[in-house]
């Protein structure tokens, strides 16, 4: 099935060199989903001692799950596009009011992860509550991506 929703945004990301075409690869998508699940399992082990690390792992789980959708379609982010291109592509195709709401958390999660990785002197410390919310949001993203990949409706983006 050709996924029409978000097509204009994907084409713009391709034209801007933020995404590139690759061979669609469901095995690669599954590997990314498995890695995302492993990250979430690790979150349960570290959140008590390292809230910032747990938040970062949660974000990485969500990002890998989002990338799994693109891998299934034969798309991958370039160095230029990076995490933002993955977020933009997935939200355009699968998120928003007409899609799966889990993907709407990606932008906030990316910004929180960035603040945790590169804190300023006045940046608040990541709390256990922050880490728990990130884990909840990441689980929703991973589950939504898993359902979409398993649906068999993702084909090469042409």
Model region roles, listed by residue range:
Residues 1-158:
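Terminal alpha-helical segments
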